[in-house]
Swiss-Prot record:
Position of the Glycyl lysine isopeptide (Lys-Gly) (interchain with G-Cter in ubiquitin) cross-link: K122
UniProt record similarity statement: Belongs to the histone H2B family.
CDD domains attached to this UniProt entry: HFD_H2B
PTM characteristics: Monoubiquitinated by the UBC2-BRE1 complex to form H2BK123ub1. H2BK123ub1 gives a specific tag for epigenetic transcriptional activation and is also prerequisite for H3K4me and H3K79me formation. H2BK123ub1 also modulates the formation of double-strand breaks during meiosis and is a prerequisite for DNA-damage checkpoint activation.
Residue stretches of biased makeup (Basic and acidic residues): 1-17
Positions of the UniProt region annotated as Disordered: 1-35
Protein function: Core component of nucleosome. Nucleosomes wrap and compact DNA into chromatin, limiting DNA accessibility to the cellular machineries which require DNA as a template. Histones thereby play a central role in transcription regulation, DNA repair, DNA replication and chromosomal stability. DNA accessibility is regulated via a complex set of post-translational modifications of histones, also called histone code, and nucleosome remodeling.
PANTHER family documented for this protein: HISTONE H2B
Superkingdom per UniProt: Eukaryota
Pfam families membership: Histone
Protein name: Histone H2B.1
Length: 129
C-alpha cells in the first residue's frame, strides 16, 4: 500500500494568532497564553486579491509582518512628533498624512496618501449611514 500525495485542492490554512492555551498551575487556576497579534491574515487576504493562485511561505510572511510593523512604528513616531510640534495631544488624519509624506519617497507617498484618503472616506460614509 503506497499513499500518494495529492496536490492540495484549496489554499493552505493561514497562520493565525495562537489560541489561548490553558494549563492548570500549582494553585489550580488555569493560566492563559498571551496571543501574538500579527498582520498575517490581512497580508494573506491582499495576496489573494492580487494573485489568487500564489502562496506565501512562513518566512516570507514573517518578513512582511516585520516590514508592516516597522512602517507602522515609523509613521506613528513621526505623527507623534508632528502633534507635539503643533501642541496637540491627539494624532489626527492630518498628522498621519503628513508623516506618510515625510517618510515614504515620492510616488509611493502619493499612492499611500490617496489610498489612505479613500479608506477614511469609505469608513466615514459607512459610519454615518
Amino acid at each position: 500500500m503506497s499513499a500518494e500525495k495529492k496536490p492540495a485542492s484549496k489554499a493552505p490554512a493561514e497562520k493565525k494568532p495562537a489560541a489561548k492555551k490553558t494549563a492548570p498551575s500549582a494553585d489550580g487556576k488555569k493560566r492563559t497564553k498571551a496571543r501574538k497579534e500579527t498582520y498575517s491574515s490581512y497580508i494573506y487576504k491582499v495576496l489573494k486579491q492580487t494573485h489568487p493562485d500564489t502562496g506565501i511561505s512562513q518566512k516570507s510572511m514573517s518578513i512582511l509582518n516585520s516590514f508592516v510593523n516597522d512602517i507602522f512604528e515609523r509613521i506613528a513616531s513621526e505623527a507623534s512628533k508632528l502633534a507635539a510640534y503643533n501642541k496637540k495631544s491627539t494624532i489626527s488624519a492630518r498628522e498621519i498624512q503628513t508623516a506618510v509624506r515625510l517618510i515614504l519617497p515620492g510616488e509611493l507617498a502619493k499612492h499611500a496618501v490617496s489610498e489612505g484618503t479613500r479608506a477614511v472616506t469609505k469608513y466615514s460614509s459607512s459610519t454615518q449611514a
